[in-house]
């Protein structure tokens, strides 16, 4: 438990950064109503804050949604629909709910958009590297581990050969993996998908102002009570002080970051991180520490942040410029900040 808490520290600090930024930049009427709660889902701490109400029911309903979708979409929950698809790989179709089908179709769409750099059949390769468990169980401050934890090239190439989202077959609500050794993993887009569903629910209940934070997936509902933008902090990689490397100003937008500091370990000082290159099977090698995507949809932000990290700055910029309503912020390994536009007032002050 001690080691897991160590890796939750950046999440807690990120929550504090967002809340602090919002509080510091907003002059609120004394009578303004607000309710905020935290919960633990998806192996991380989530926080939902609503303005204009003190009714916790809306947040509790969102937490119920988190539990429902975790039980439906997680490949670590044995009875989930995704686990059933994996268990039946190469054998038979599995009938799934409309929500699971929607997310799988989105995953396939992102696979096409990224030319396979984002692939929801990466499950076995991710399991092989085992970043979450290894990083959580090390007592080293720098996540230094024994060289024996690094998989062999033969193992990596073997699992990589089963990473191909085109092996997903869909017939109505029936889904099958045609490769018996493939494994579906929706973790790269599930939190964004769930955040979008929560926002839609809140809007249906006439909630017009709030923040949904699912462990780094920040989705704002509407704008602040005075009509101004929210200020959201972008985490400084490998920093546990809580100070953001920069902030952005947004309203009714999603802010999602993928970074190598989220799950990693080191062997003899060499860093291995969880963002895997689907062309090599190894952690992506480039000069990036993190990529943040600002978009309308948190699900889009999830997929695009991973994709853009894998592509590298130049190709990622080309992709972002081809999309409508999407911008990116890149943090390089020398802590330089590169943006695709100045629309969201990126500030380091």
Q: What residues fall within each predicted segment?
A:
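Mature catalytic core of soluble alpha/beta enzymes
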Residues: 2-349
């Amino acid at each position: 438990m001690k080691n897991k808490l160590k890796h939750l520290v950046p999440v807690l600090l990120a929550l504090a950064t967002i809340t602090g930024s919002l509080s510091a930049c907003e002059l609120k009427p004394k009578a303004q109503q607000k309710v905020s709660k935290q919960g633990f889902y998806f192996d991380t701490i989530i926080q939902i804050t609503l303005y204009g109400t003190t009714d916790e029911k809306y947040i509790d309903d969102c937490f119920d949604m988190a539990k429902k979708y975790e039980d439906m979409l997680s490949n670590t929950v044995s009875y989930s629909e995704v686990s059933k698809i994996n268990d039946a790989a190469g054998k038979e179709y599995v009938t799934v709910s409309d929500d699971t089908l929607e997310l799988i179709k989105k995953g396939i769409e992102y696979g096409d958009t990224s030319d396979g750099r984002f692939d929801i059949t990466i499950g076995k390769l991710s399991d092989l590297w085992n970043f979450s468990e290894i990083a959580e169980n090390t007592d080293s401050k720098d996540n230094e581990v024994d060289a024996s934890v690094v998989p062999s090239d033969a193992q990596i190439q073997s699992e990589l050969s089963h990473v191909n989202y085109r092996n997903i077959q869909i017939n109505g609500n029936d889904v099958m993996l045609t490769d018996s050794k493939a494994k579906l993993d929706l973790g790269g887009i599930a939190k964004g998908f769930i955040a979008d569903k929560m926002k839609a629910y809140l809007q249906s209940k006439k909630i017009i102002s709030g923040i949904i934070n699912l462990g780094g997936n920040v989705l704002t509902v509407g704008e602040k009570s005075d009509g101004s933008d929210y200020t959201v902090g972008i985490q400084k990689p490998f920093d546990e002080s809580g100070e953001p490397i920069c902030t952005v100003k947004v309203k009714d937008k999603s802010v999602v970051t993928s970074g190598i500091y989220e799950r990693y370990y080191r062997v003899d000082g060499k860093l291995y991180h969880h963002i895997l290159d689907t062309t090599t099977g190894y952690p992506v090698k480039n000069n990036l520490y993190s990529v943040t995507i600002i978009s309308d949809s948190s699900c889009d932000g999830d997929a695009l942040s991973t994709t853009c990290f894998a592509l590298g700055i130049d190709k990622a910029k080309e992709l972002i410029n081809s999309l409508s309503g999407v911008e990116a912020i890149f943090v390089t390994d020398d802590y330089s900040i590169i943006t695709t536009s100045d629309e969201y007032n990126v500030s380091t002050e």
